């Protein structure tokens, strides 16, 4: 018996996520049994703006609350859901400064753990090229702002 080909028609999804900075550290989440490190993100709820969804998803997936510092580049990609349905996904990302909370207080639906990493280690651990690109953009913004004050989420 042959496996049916994926549908050529793609449904569309819109998500939002965030890169949280605390001093010189970045917060990542592990999924897929801890084998994949990525930025927290999730679907927009009805009537929710991307920035609101990013803050909510970061809080739900990491236990950490952050304040939006800047919008980052969006990411577009296509994937197969359950090997059958083609999904076109757009994710709006935001740079967030750490505000409060603990990375041990999250909802463990899809997330295995949340952990702080140094910038170089975070970039190296991120499993997806799109996430690495977003993280590099975020750090360029952090460096630019460090000339004005301290890093987002740092001690002032």
State the predicted function of each range.
Residues 8, 41, 79, 134-136, ...:
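Residue-level signature of transmembrane alpha-helix interfaces in integral membrane proteins
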Residues 40, 46, 151-155:
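Functional cleft and adjacent loop/helix regions within the main domain
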Residues 3-4, 63, 151:
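N-terminal compositionally biased, intrinsically disordered segments and leader/signal-like regions
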Residues 124-156:
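Charged phosphate-binding loop/patch that engages nucleotide di/tri-phosphates or the phosphate backbone
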Residues 2-39:
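N-terminal strand-loop-strand
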Residues 2-9, 79-82, 156:
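Class I (Rossmann-like) S-adenosyl-L-methionine-dependent methyltransferase catalytic domain
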Residues 44-133:
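Unchanged
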